[in-house]
């Protein structure tokens, strides 16, 4: 389906996906520090699920495990767009993932 999302296979061993997850956490931390909100002390653990979507570049939807300052493992949803021809990537969104019941 053009414009639809595609699930990424073998996420835990996909180096590019794991690097995008690490970038997402680092960028979130950097943005939080510039806002001086007191947040932004997450430590990347791993991407546990990912989907891609072709837009003006490739948009990645990542489910990321990160460790909080207090040592708790939490799951976050991140959106990153990569435009390889411009050598650019941008974090579009980063928030706690909804808790599955």
From Swiss-Prot:
Domain of life: Eukaryota
Pfam family membership, one: SQAPI
InterPro entries per UniProt: Cystatin_dom (IPR000010), Cystatin_sf (IPR046350), Prot_inh_cystat_CS (IPR018073)
GO molecular function, one term: cysteine-type endopeptidase inhibitor activity
Keywords: Protease inhibitor, Thiol protease inhibitor
Keyword Zinc-finger included in the entry's annotation: no
Keyword Nucleotide-binding: no
Family affiliation: Belongs to the cystatin family.
Biological role stated in the UniProt entry: Strong inhibitor of papain, ficin and cathepsin H, B and L.
Identification of the protein by name: Cysteine proteinase inhibitor B
Species this chain originates from: Helianthus annuus
